Amino acid sequence: MPCGKLYILLFLLLNATLSWSQNQGKMSSYVRKAIMTNKAKSQFGARKSPFKGDLGGLTALVKTSDIHLLRKYGCKIYANWDNIYIASIPLDNVSSLCSYPAIQRIEAGRSCSITNDNSGTIIRARDVWNSSAPLSATGKGVIIGVMDIGFDLTHPNWYSADMQKYRIKQIWDMLDSSEDGEPVIGKTDTGNDTIYVGRQYIGTEAILNKRYSADGLTQYHGTHTMGTATGSGAEGNGIISPYTGMAPEAEMCVVANYTSNNKDIVPIADMYKYTTATDLLGFKYIFDYAESVGKPCVINFSEGTYDDLNESKLYQEVLNKMLGPGRILCSAAGNDGAKNTYIHKAEGESKKGAFLTSSSKDASYIMRSKKPVKMQLSFYQNDESGKSKVEKVKWEYDMTKLSAFPDSVMKDTLLIGNERFAVCLCTYPECYDKTLFASEFLISDVDNDTFGKNTDISFAVLGADNDIEVFYCTGSFKSNSLDNSLCDFQQTHSILFPASTQNVITVGATAHITTVTSHTGAVYGDNFGTNGVKTSFSGVGPALNGCIKPDVMAPGVNIVSSTNSYREDLHLEDKYGSRVFEYEGRKHYWAMGKGTSMACPAVTGVIALWLQVCPTLTPEQIKDVFAHTCTHYDESMSYPNNYYGWGEIDALAGIEYINRVYTGIEEHIINDKGRTIYDINGMKVNNIKRRGIYIISDGKAVRKYVR
């Protein structure tokens, strides 16, 4: 049944992913969605549209051999890596740009979502702080970047332990619409344009006067993650809490970004200004600051969005250009490990499927196949007695027919009983292997706030001559006694993006403790296991690109860290407030959290310790350190694997390995006879008794020795 105009408008405004025609195959599907949403606003008029005013610009990656085309069509250019640019593009001009052969691709993706007292001991960061040189490190001389939401900039945790030094050096608040602070200027080979989102604040006075990020009255996440990575544990007045972060002497550069969690404070007309390309500008902002002060840098990104097969070609290319010696990005694996996320129908199998489920009103999925997909939906509703459900409609579709539709996108509205379900299908060449087909499927429960409120829906892929993989997006899978044969799902392929990217350090969560005592003396906590077992929620690989993920694990349950004292609805006097203290007339808090979001900054902080002793470490070298030093919960498994990666990080073993392999400093036993020994200051000594660094000459060679 064809959709009516009103239904089309409603459908275009869903969180769908739409594809391209041959002429617009240069666009990622999210860019295509932005254009169609913009067209819907124009077609149906402002009176029927939820948008007030113009939709504004789209922040996107553009690969082009002619930069003048971007200027011609009113684009502002914020950054470039050779012929790849990040630019704001007027939405009305995107299609026209794509008509030029010099424009090779325009890409953007949807915004992300957010995904330690004992942690420092478990992963031996405290042992690193307390060791003698060259094993000792505290993060001094290293920049930790944090891109997140909900920052309390006044928490004493950001000072040095003695409260003499405020360690946040600058912040770009992408959601700040005030006239305070300073604009952020994008720098490219062809000129400098002012970036049209947010304001930056530089220096202690400006940052403390700001007090909190623009979303600070409703969010807290970044205050917690940054505390785990680099909090000093300070409460002021000479008091140090037990909740010191992994790298307590590192300095910080912060970006407060846009996510699905804080989007309500941004005008809907500005939604396409905030994309994955905008997040790349945030990473660049942090790395540029580190470059300006000549220090190594590791960024914590405890956010992500579901992976796909076509959104991120340019994103990954640019990210690979950013990362390298002394430039590291850590990203959370995500918390979807307990969801049923994947179906595989091999050649020779006639049918595989499951029932659909979603926490929102729509469920979307992507598929990879050798041939166009044939699929089937069955809708079950109450029978006339109202006591049991029966199959009311069976809907089948062969995607070979999509070529007959405009832009190879099929939209339909199905009337099942008295309820409407909008369906959208599209197909295109697969990103990683052009010989394969990628397809997208979205179904929305138009008349209800939650998906499948009154109707159970099963899904199956068909055809013994085709190999088909189905991956979750906004929906997942479940079983149902209405058809017990449809339970072909697996709990794999749940690593979020950009954690799925090869050169990103992907962090999963382990469990060690089951309780935390709050400031009131009450005992709370979540029991996900002990002794370093993977939590059930921690994302599982492989990534859609085939990479083994995660790379490494860290504690992610019952983690106590700093939290945002400005959040109005947090009610920190309850179980989440593990400790309360007052500094300069304001109450501040330590609170409990869980998730791969909490595990990721522990790894970020440990890598900062490692960068202190070897500032040129690359992502590949860090993974080599993991391979030789991580601890293994289950020795019967081979490592790396798609559950634990290389295992749980060990800060001290890592530094020992780095010193031995990458800095040339190692600890070993020597015979002093026949050798001339000098201390680090060049003074001759008779023998080696104290711990320290020595220079030894035996007439054949000169070498460093560490005791």
Regions found by a protein language model. Give the residues of each.
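Autoinhibitory N-terminal propeptides
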Residues: 19-135, 143, 261
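N-terminal domain-start motif of subtilase-like serine proteases
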Residues: 30-52, 93, 112-164, 204-221, ...
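C-terminal subdomain of the subtilisin-like protease fold in secreted/lumenal serine endopeptidases
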Residues: 49-50, 265, 296-298, 303-311, ...
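Subtilisin-like serine protease catalytic core
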Residues: 130-275, 294-298, 311, 324-328, ...
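Active-site core segment of subtilase-fold serine proteases
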Residues: 151-223, 227, 245-247, 293, ...
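Hydrolase catalytic cores
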Residues: 226, 253-260, 287-297, 326, ...
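Short acidic, glycine-rich surface-loop motifs adjacent to enzyme active sites
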Residues: 257, 281-310, 332, 455-465, ...
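Residue-level detector of functionally pivotal "anchor" positions at catalytic/ligand-binding pockets or at interdomain
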Residues: 655-681
